[in-house]
């Protein structure tokens, strides 16, 4: 068991960007087998898996992750990785303790935000896009984007305390993720007044119905794009978009990348 220093990971570092404000963005890739024992990292970090995958083990759970998966690691938290697929590639957002204090955030808040996976994934992709832009505004922009992570946690807390119909609505929307339901359709299924959904949806979901459905669709598309098994037109139709151009516009709006740019990451 050993502890990795700041901005160090078991894989090869392909790109690293330090804002000098408490955030480091590190892109890592795994081409060959690496150390599979217990280890930890100095700083807390969020990892978005872009390609490949691995079996992630902690003291209390084991999980197989792949493209589009999102995990949070507390500072000094012991974990190990086994059965890594090659090649694998990850984006790691590493957070200094001092920045958490400045933003009045805790590791627990960040861990909670990861449960709102689509919103947090898209923030990470936008942060990574800023590292590729890498101009005089990028460091401040990355800090501003990261500070939004608390929004995901706030809406999760409201969601957990919500009426029963809200959870039923979430399940329904995720079940029909590749469809385009309207308020009347949803209200009929849930035996509600459409105004009830319209009035309370932003409070519990943190956005409009249309925005939520776009997030679900684009979130589902991430693994489809990285699998290279379908072209963009097929993916657009599979995810319920009217055409490829609509899909491309929505994908860029949510992630900061064009689909083909994301595919090449």
Language model segments and positions:
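N-terminal regulatory/effector-sensing and dimerization cores
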Residues: 2-3, 9-109
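Short, Lys/Arg-enriched N-terminal segment that forms or immediately precedes the first helix
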Residues: 31, 152-157, 203-206
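Short, conserved glycine- and acidic-residue-centered signature motifs
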Residues: 42, 162, 214
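Conserved coupling/switch loops of ABC nucleotide-binding domains, chiefly the family-specific signature
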Residues: 51, 258-260
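An amphipathic alpha-helical interaction segment
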Residues: 93, 97-104, 113-180, 184, ...
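Terminal helix-turn-helix DNA-binding modules in bacterial transcription factors
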Residues: 171, 175, 180, 184, ...
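The DNA-contacting recognition helix of HTH DNA-binding domains
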Residues: 194-195, 199, 244-245
């Amino acid at each position: 068991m050993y502890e990795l220093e700041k901005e160090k990971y078991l894989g090869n570092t392909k790109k690293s960007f330090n804002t000098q404000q408490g955030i480091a963005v590190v892109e890592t890739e795994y081409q060959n087998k690496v150390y599979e024992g217990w280890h930890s990292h100095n700083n807390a970090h969020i990892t978005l898996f872009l390609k490949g995958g691995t079996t992630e083990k902690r003291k209390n759970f084991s999980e197989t992750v792949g493209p589009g998966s999102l995990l949070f690691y507390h500072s000094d938290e012991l974990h190990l990785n086994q059965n890594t697929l090659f090649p694998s590639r990850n984006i790691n957002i590493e957070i200094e303790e001092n920045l958490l204090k400045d933003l009045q955030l805790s590791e627990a808040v960040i861990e909670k935000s990861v449960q709102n996976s689509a919103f947090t994934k898209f923030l990470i992709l936008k942060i990574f896009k800023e590292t590729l832009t890498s101009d005089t505004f990028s460091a401040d922009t990355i800090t501003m984007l990261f500070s939004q992570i608390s929004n995901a946690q706030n809406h999760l807390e409201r969601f957990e305390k919500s009426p029963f119909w809200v959870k039923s609505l979430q399940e329904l929307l995720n079940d029909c993720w590749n469809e385009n339901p309207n308020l009347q359709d949803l209200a009929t299924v849930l035996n509600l007044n459409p105004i009830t959904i319209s009035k309370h949806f932003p409070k519990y979901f943190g956005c409009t119905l249309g925005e939520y459905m776009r997030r679900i669709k684009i979130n589902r598309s991430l693994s489809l794009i990285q699998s290279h098994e379908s072209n963009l037109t097929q993916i657009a139709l599979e995810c319920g978009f009217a055409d490829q151009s609509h899909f491309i516009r929505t994908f860029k709006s949510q992630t900061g990348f064009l689909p083909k740019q994301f595919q090449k990451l």
